[in-house]
Amino acid sequence: MTMALASSKAFSSIFNTLSPINQSKFVLACSGSNHVDVIDRRRRIMIFGSSLALTSSLLGSNQQRLPMESAIALEQFKEKEEELEEEEERNVNLFQKTSPSVVYIEAIELPKTSSGDILTDEENGKIEGTGSGFVWDKLGHIVTNYHVIAKLATDQFGLQRCKVSLVDAKGTRFSKEGKIVGLDPDNDLAVLKIETEGRELNPVVLGTSNDLRVGQSCFAIGNPYGYENTLTIGVVSGLGREIPSPNGKSISEAIQTDADINSGNSGGPLLDSYGHTIGVNTATFTRKGSGMSSGVNFAIPIDTVVRTVPYLIVYGTAYRDRF
């Protein structure tokens, strides 16, 4: 069908290139002298034959070139498609490997009875806020942001509870109460402890943050707005940033990223392309009143976390030092 169309256009092009004189001769020959008709017919046959030969040659070369160009384009498309599939597969594998280490944290306030007694049933409690965290070790230590559990940390009336939901190494989901082990408001870090009851947990694999480079890929996993196990992808946008801590001091060497960190992502891990934890997601700049990520987000560098968490696990934070 394509060749028929090409030949038709070629013939039309050939006919239209004839001069008005030749065209008028052709018309006159059809209506008059036989001598003129024969001469003009021979001349026209010669012109048509030469043009047709040229057209056939051009079409033949195009026929040879077009399939070759199409084959190259198709091969390039397949290569790009395979690259995309490989990248997607890497992202899927990274998420499947690391998400079992991420926990969902609910800050719960227990209700009081009319007589002032506290109801200890968490099912009747009010969820004051949600956040994220990650499994530090197989003993049940959980790392999160201080501001995620600040109400529990400063509770003087026994009204606050912390519920930690996660999966064990077998993929079984369970929830336990998180008890405070240690706090570091200066760096917006906290360590909780849950009872494992013989379950095997999935601790994160720790990376380093001192060798990060702007432009490298990074991945944030958390529970934004209560949507558990949400993955967002971006790059390291900046290094050595300074951000405020919950107590008004400054956290230095923060990692800036455009991977979305929304409300509920706080405390979750920031990962590199190998699935190693390189930071703790903690803050985002938002437009006033929107509460949504602006693409300027921050994480506490893992080197700071590695210096802080073991100390908190060993020495803890005395209750009197929380206020």
Curated annotation (Swiss-Prot):
Per UniProt, the enzyme's principal EC class comes to hydrolase
Q: Which UniProt keywords apply?
A: Chloroplast, Hydrolase, Plastid, Protease, Serine protease, Thylakoid, Transit peptide
Q: Which GO terms describe its cellular component?
A: chloroplast; chloroplast thylakoid lumen; cytosol; thylakoid; thylakoid lumen
Localization: Plastid, Chloroplast thylakoid lumen
Q: Annotated region Serine protease: where?
A: 186-283
Matching entries from Pfam families are given as: Trypsin_2
Which Gene3D superfamilies has this protein been placed in?
Trypsin-like serine proteases
Q: What is its EC number?
A: 3.4.21.-
The record's annotation in InterPro entries points to: Chloro_Bact_Ser_Proteases, Peptidase_S1_PA, Peptidase_S1_PA_chymotrypsin, Peptidase_S1C
Gene Ontology terms describing biological process:
photosystem II repair; proteolysis
Catalytic residues, chain numbering: 147 (charge relay system), 188 (charge relay system), 266 (charge relay system)
Protein name, please? Answer: Protease Do-like 5, chloroplastic
Whichever gene encodes this chain, its name is DEGP5
